[in-house]
């Protein structure tokens, strides 16, 4: 039986369909999860996709964090379930306390939409084992509030524990502290990143297929769990 990976849809989510397709391309069963669901339908992992959940009112991810399904995601993550937050999903995971820090308005206050080179800094997470350390991958970036910020002590802790998972290569597109594009939880099971790997799973339709590695990695994690 193939792994079951849930993909959450909030009001305002845009990239759930692409995440579902990425899951299927990797060879897993995609399970649609609605924001009001009170259970996770026996999934093995969860993806919180990008978009503008609840219109980004208050601040990005602030309302989605209180959706019924997120209560279940937090409980499951605390028990070791792999969770991936992409763009708005990363913001939601930070708001939910599963990842430290916050995502704020881009430096320069412009929405950014471009293909972005990333450096894979950690391959020790549930979502990055298929990559080589230091690999350069090309992934679309599209966000207005993608500037990662945290207290200096938190940044030092992330660096010291190897929890910076992705870093922007070359110029820093949004002013994120230390060029951070993605981080993980202490156990490596929860990962959040601003760029969109689900838009880079097929060379025909994306800038590359470099993003597929995240979805393949979690399948490896689930098989060996």
Curated annotation (Swiss-Prot):
Pathway: Purine metabolism; IMP biosynthesis via de novo pathway; 5-amino-1-(5-phospho-D-ribosyl)imidazole from N(2)-formyl-N(1)-(5-phospho-D-ribosyl)glycinamide: step 1/2. The active site is at 87 (nucleophile), 196, 198. GO terms for cellular component: cytoplasm. GO terms for biological process: 'de novo' IMP biosynthetic process. InterPro entries: Class_I_gatase-like, PRibForGlyAmidine_synth_PurQ. One of its GO terms (molecular function) is ATP binding. The keyword Thylakoid does not apply. Residues 4-225 form the Glutamine amidotransferase type-1 domain. It catalyses: N(2)-formyl-N(1)-(5-phospho-beta-D-ribosyl)glycinamide + L-glutamine + ATP + H2O = 2-formamido-N(1)-(5-O-phospho-beta-D-ribosyl)acetamidine + L-glutamate + ADP + phosphate + H(+); L-glutamine + H2O = L-glutamate + NH4(+). It is found in: Cytoplasm. Transmembrane segments: none annotated. Keywords: ATP-binding, Cytoplasm, Glutamine amidotransferase, Hydrolase, Ligase, Nucleotide-binding, Purine biosynthesis. NCBIfam families: FGAM_synth_I, PRK03619.1. Part of the FGAM synthase complex composed of 1 PurL, 1 PurQ and 2 PurS subunits. PANTHER family: PHOSPHORIBOSYLFORMYLGLYCINAMIDINE SYNTHASE SUBUNIT PURQ. Part of the phosphoribosylformylglycinamidine synthase complex involved in the purines biosynthetic pathway. Catalyzes the ATP-dependent conversion of formylglycinamide ribonucleotide (FGAR) and glutamine to yield formylglycinamidine ribonucleotide (FGAM) and glutamate. The FGAM synthase complex is composed of three subunits. PurQ produces an ammonia molecule by converting glutamine to glutamate. PurL transfers the ammonia molecule to FGAR to form FGAM in an ATP-dependent manner. This is Phosphoribosylformylglycinamidine synthase subunit PurQ. The lineage of its organism: Bacteria, Bacillati, Actinomycetota, Actinomycetes, Mycobacteriales. The gene is purQ.
